[in-house]
Amino acid sequence: MAGWDELQEGSAPEEQEYGPISRTDMVRYQGASGDFNPIHHDEEFAKSAGYPSVFSVGMLQAGILAGFATDWLGAANVRRYAVQFREQVWPGDVVVCSGTVTRKYDEDGEHKVDVDLLCTRQASGGAAIKGAATFVVP
């Protein structure tokens, strides 16, 4: 976990790859989250809705990105986490998570950093999720 003295604006951890995301991963996440929309597990349903195949629940990637961020800066230190869903993740995709410190400051007696986060699809380079978070840093 990165500490206050190690971090500067522009600091970034090593990118991390996750996957390939399998249909089993997708169904497991659906079971854990209670989101059973058939577009994420029923091939015929997804195709009838105009998609080439089933695709991952966006919150799966949001969880992967959150795990990346908390591995970097500590789960107990999260003060804010927000994401925007940009692009579907398909079975077999590998996603790559990255982050950058955008602001380092003191507020309310605590050291804090704001970070931009990104989860991209390795195959296309497209952003699956863009995120932002605030962490307290000891």
Model-derived features: where do they sit?
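HotDog/MaoC-like acyl-thioester-processing domains
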Residues: M1-E15, Q88-P138
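Hot-dog-fold acyl-thioester-processing enzymes
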Residues: M1-N77
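Glycine-rich loops and low-complexity Gly/Arg-rich segments
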Residues: I39-E44, R79-Y81, D108-G109, R121-G126
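Mid-chain, well-packed structural core segment of small domains
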Residues: D71-C97
